[in-house]
Amino acid sequence: MKNDLRYCKILNTNINVTNMKKTVDYLTDHLEELRGDYICVSNVHTTMMSFRNKDYNRVQNSCAMALPDGKPLSIVCKARGFYDADRVPGPDLMPEMFKISKEKGYRHYFYGSSQETLKKLREELNRNYPWLNIAGMYSPPYRALTQAEEERIIREINDSKPDFIWVALGAPKQEEWMYRHRFQVRGVMIGVGAAFDFCAGTVRRAPAWMQELCLEWLYRLMQDPQRLFSRYFSTNISFLFKVAKENHEYKRENKDKKIAMIGHKRIPSREGGVEIVVDEISTRLTERGYHVDAYNRSGYHVSGKEFDEKRGKIYNGIRLITIPTFKSSSLNAIVYALLATIRVLFGQYGIIHYHAEGSCVMLGIPKFFGKHVVATIHGLDWQRAKWGNFASRVLKYGEKQAAKKADAIIVLSRNVQEYFKDQYNRETIFIPNGIDKPCLKENREILKCFGLRKNDYILFLARLVPEKGAHYLIEAYRQLKTEKKLVIAGGDSHASEYMERIYQSVKENNNIIMTGFVQGRILEELYSNAYVFVQPSDIEGMAMTLLEAMSYGNCCLVSNIPENIEVVEDKAMSFQKGDVADLKEKLQYLLENESVVRNYKEKSSAFICGKYNWEDVVDRTVQAYFGNAGEGK
């Protein structure tokens, strides 16, 4: 279970990289596994105690979770590349769990503080959370308890059948008590310090602005200067000095773990396969402790302005850096690649990872400055029909730059691997894309929006550009004898003339449905309910839509280009690339033979999810970064 959690080690103490929502979700999802274990809510004071005391360090690092209560801890985590790190204060976690208890029916036990505080706490809880199941409360004496008293208290706690045991004894006493009694209690123990007093109203908490400015300690100091002055002065000064020293060492030791991604349009996005790949790999790299900066491109969203959403600076632990570009489609890609490349020179990256041939035009610049550069060739882009002569030559130049100067080249298909060997005598690393097994969705939204029922339609899903072959499918569909509909799902990609030609060719046929760009629930439903998925491309790198269609258990009909056949093997039907008559014949056969379609559907999902998975992709990508992936494999 601990493998699901991310940590940042601060002064030899593991601090969770999390936020309030993730913490609440984790507690509810893993409650049964957490029973008997304990959670520390850490701040600067407990972290310094852990640094100075080996026994207390063992207590801190043995817990199931160590939540960053103090703002300074989340700041340190962010400074070390854990960009999604945030605070999870104990006094805020308690109310969040109380709210969710209305639905979940959780039982809560409160151990610690004074009898007077517990009495007021009960009154406040009954007033603010009348649904809350208070399993019990106990204020232990200030003296050390005998073994018999300890056993009696644990027995009473267990008899009350709590889900959560909130412990407020103050540090280090509460952590040591939880450590001593772990796996003896039936609930999960959470040490929350002064949270009982804050919730009961017996002690005022620092205002939010002081918490944001890391001045909560100052507010507490003003409340009790005689007791806290020497502690805070010693602790805070020591923490700042030692963390600064540790940060310097951390940056030096973890330089190779900082990665820049260049070449996609933006993440999160489904504008193309490159965006999906960068998203999947980057997310998993951050989960493994790598620090990833994704250089997004501003400007026109190929699928429509309504999908050009504003994103924050952090997404799934990835730092998003947006590079401004011109609106002109002919200039924005090259300007983006140049500006992103200049920006990464100042980023102290261990790896600069270029995606697609276009961005590789600038690959020589970081190489000149001694940077470690990796290129992923998603396909031979210069061959695509949508590009004019000049654009094709620029893309070809990017390909040559990658072949000549990249420290490692990743390719998605054996066909492209052979091309690089034949054309440039350059060894490459074959790492195909991955896929996760999805959950099938009923046809709720597509029925409402498009009138589509299960097995009622043939599905095409890709950008509407010439090389994706939608025109072949439309022409073949017109010749079919069928009542099934044809769904053309996808946005354009700077191919407005082709897009217009497609719309003109289908406007008289009510059985051909143009959905435009789709994502989310509608996309999932289209995959889940199709009769046949058709992929008629002339050119591909490794089509993510084909992997996705098979993962949903679809019967697939694909053009017989090597990149498609390599993926599907004998688990899909193929037709001669660009041959409308052959495509029509194969489609008619599948329409008339439901048992054949059913047979393909039964095999496709298990086959594709077993053959390709993202964790394997990331394993091999990391190996490629550091030079031990094995060339040509």
Model-derived segments and spans:
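Glycosyltransferase donor-sugar binding loop
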Residues: S114-Q115, P141-Y142, G299-Y300, I435, ...
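Conserved acidic donor-binding segment of nucleotide-sugar-dependent glycosyltransferases
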Residues: M573-A581, Y589-S595
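Short hydrophobic beta-strand element within catalytic cores of glycosyltransferases
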Residues: C555-V558
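Membrane-proximal helix-turn-helix segments that form the acceptor-binding/catalytic region
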Residues: D55-C63, E96-E103, I342-L345, S392-I409, ...
